[in-house]
């Protein structure tokens, strides 16, 4: 990484508190920004350790990319998770691990996702203003619920982002996403999901993949043998995906 240690700075972008990580020279402007949103129940900084790992995997990222990790706006203290955050609340049956109708979940628009979308959009707008990067030079992504929100945002921004990274995410808001995705033909998407995911089933991830592919998005789908997690080989593929975004589509 050109001998520079990544620095991590807490700041507020738009409506959300964020952690910003890069290894750029002091005062340098990034050529690409990557916004990654954590999952339901995780602390706001849960994904921050991914930045130095990705920077170490690909030297080009260290020289040219800035990572931004927004914290979700909702607290889960009332559920016994004082440091847990959420982008939107989940139905009680999901929280209790009861049988879930994932086909129905895929069709429904989750209450609260619109507010979560506005929050992430405010981060993207503030980041674009601060770095002078157009939306087309900002990659969006997230893990689990964070992947749902950033998929929703990527399909609704006025301008297409540089790419979308869905890490163990799932399908929701199906009718709206299908309609919006038709305007995102060619958008590069990296999607990874564990075959043994017992939180968000692999079959639902396949339905999301199929929706995006049918709409003409360029999806790199990476299944791995594992549960609801981020696998080492997934990180390697993600790093390569981000390097490709440096060169444009």
Protein language model regions, located:
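Gly/Ala-rich beta-loop-alpha elbow adjacent to hydrolase catalytic centers
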Residues: 142-146, 150
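Active-site signature of alpha/beta-hydrolase-fold catalytic machinery across serine-
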Residues: 49, 152-156
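Short alpha-helix in the alpha/beta-hydrolase fold that links the catalytic acid
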Residues: 49-51, 177, 201-211
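Alpha/beta-hydrolase fold nucleophile elbow
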Residues: 132-142
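Short beta-strand/loop motif that positions the catalytic acidic residue
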Residues: 190-193, 197
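A conserved short beta-strand
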Residues: 159-171
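C-terminal catalytic histidine-bearing segment of alpha/beta-hydrolase fold enzymes
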Residues: 203-249
């Amino acid at each position: 990484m050109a001998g520079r240690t990544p620095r991590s700075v807490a700041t507020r972008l738009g409506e959300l508190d964020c952690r910003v990580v890069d290894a750029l020279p002091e005062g340098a402007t990034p050529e690409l920004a990557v916004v990654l949103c954590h999952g339901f129940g995780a602390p706001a900084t849960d994904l921050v350790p991914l930045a130095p790992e990705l920077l170490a995997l690909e030297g080009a990222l260290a020289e040219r990319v800035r990572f931004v990790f927004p914290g979700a706006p909702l607290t889960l203290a009332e559920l016994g998770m004082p440091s847990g955050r959420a982008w939107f609340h989940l139905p009680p049956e999901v929280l209790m691990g009861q049988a879930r109708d994932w086909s129905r979940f895929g069709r429904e628009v989750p209450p609260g996702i619109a507010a979560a979308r506005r929050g992430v959009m405010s981060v993207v707008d503030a980041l674009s203003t601060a770095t002078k990067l157009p939306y087309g030079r900002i990659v969006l992504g997230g893990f689990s619920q964070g992947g749902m929100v950033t998929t929703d945002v990527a399909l609704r921004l006025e301008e297409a982002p540089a790419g979308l990274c869905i890490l163990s995410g799932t399908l929701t808001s199906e009718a709206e996403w299908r309609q919006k995705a038709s305007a995102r033909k060619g958008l590069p998407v990296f999607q990874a999901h564990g075959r043994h995911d017992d939180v968000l089933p692999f079959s639902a991830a396949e339905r999301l993949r199929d929706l995006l592919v049918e709409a003409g998005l360029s999806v790199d789908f990476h299944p791995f043998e594992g549960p609801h997690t981020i696998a080492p080989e997934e990180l390697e593929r993600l790093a390569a995906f981000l390097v490709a975004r440096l060169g444009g589509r």
